[in-house]
Amino acid sequence: MATRTADKLEKKLVVVVGGTSGLGFAVAQAAVDRKANVVVASSKQASVDDALSRLQAGLASDDDVARVRGLTLDLAAANVEEQIVALYDFASKNGQQKIDHIAVTAGDSLYPKALDQVKAEDFINASQVRVIGALLLAKHAAKYLAKSAASSFTLTSGVRDVRPAANFAPVAPVSAAVKSLAKTLAHDLAPIRVNSISPGAVRTEFFTKIAGEHADAVLQGLAEQTLTKSNGVAEDIAEIYLVVMTSAYIDGADLVADGGSLIA
C-alpha cells in the first residue's frame, strides 16, 4: 500500500541549512510537525540554540525532543568545506544513517545598490553563501544522501532575475545562478532530485533587516504588484519545500510562489 502523504516524512532525516529563522525555520518546523528527524544549521550558535528551544517546545517526550538537533555552519568561512563535512557527519551520526532531504535556505542580506555605486565585492558577497556555499553543500551531500529519487536537495532562489528592477544589478543575477545550479546539480546528483524554490516578497526577519523602518511600506508596495494583493507567509512557502521532499517525480524544477507577481 502506498505511503500516505502525511506520513512520508515520518522518521526521515531532514537537514535545513539556514533553519534557525524566517523561511528556514518554517521549513524546519513543518518537518518536525510531520515527525521527521530534523537538523538545523546556522552561522551563529545563539541562533541554533534559540531555534532548538522553539522547535522542541511543543514536543512531549524525550524521544521527540531528541529528533531535533542543530549545529553551526558558516558558509562564508574560509574552512567552509570542513564545516560542511562536520555538519553532515553530525546529522548522519557519522554515517550510521543516510540523510533523506537537504533544504538550503541560508543567505546573507542582499542590498540593492545604484549601478554607479556597485563594487566587485557586492556581487561576490551576494554569491558567497547562496551560490558558492550551495555548490559546496551539494559537493559533499552526494556521500551522505540516500541515493534514490525519494531523496532531495533543494535550493532557494527568488524572482528578481525574471522581474528585475533598477538597482538590483548585483542581486538579481544571483537568483538566476541558483536556478541554473539546481538544474545542473540534478544531473550531477541523479537519481537524487534537485530543485529550487523562488519565493516572492515574504515577511520574515530577513526582509525586515534589509528594509529596516521602511519594511511595512515596501511590503505593501510589493503586495500591490501581485494578483493576490498580498505578501507571502513563511509557513505557506515552507509547505512547498515539503511538497518537493515528498513528491518523487519533481526534479530539475523551479517552483515559484509569488502571489502571481510575475504575470500581474
From Swiss-Prot:
Its EC number is 1.1.-.-. The chain crosses the membrane at residues 13-32. One of its GO terms (molecular function) is oxidoreductase activity. The keyword DNA-binding does not apply. GO terms for cellular component: membrane. The active site is at S157. Short-chain dehydrogenase/reductase; part of the gene cluster that mediates the biosynthesis of UCS1025A, a member of the pyrrolizidinone family that acts as a strong telomerase inhibitor and displays potent antibacterial and antitumor properties. These compounds share a hemiaminal-containing pyrrolizidinone core fused with a gamma-lactone, giving a furopyrrolizidine that is connected to a decalin fragment. Belongs to the short-chain dehydrogenases/reductases (SDR) family. This is Short-chain dehydrogenase/reductase ucsE.
